[in-house]
């Protein structure tokens, strides 16, 4: 499933998972990966300042794959703002997001069109959630979708901490021609 979703080889996924496990970022187990059990459940603001250099590298890598003029969905999560910052110099982007922080960052680029889903603002992580945000997705198709995840199940299914976030991401992935997981 990940091979198809990420459009990379099984060897690439295996190598990346081994690297993440060796650096205690993820915990590898038979048939899948998950959150390192030694990892504390930190607040969003605490997670924002963790691994900043890695998040900027991820942002630069993803931004290098996005052409000018693309339509992009950007999910919620602490890696999404560095990705948005890496996209600031692109021109003609159309951004669809449920992340207020991403919208504010990309609003610095006057050549960027930003579409924000409606719904309830969840202040702890700057996310817009709710049924109206899911309905919003049915009206927008994008070339690229950029997603954050909580973990990966044994069967390769991408998981999140909140079922509403997982449901929203599932709809957004269906609306995206190409997906990136960050």
Question: Which stretches of residues belong to each language-model region?
Answer:
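Conserved SAM/SAH-binding loop
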Residues: 80
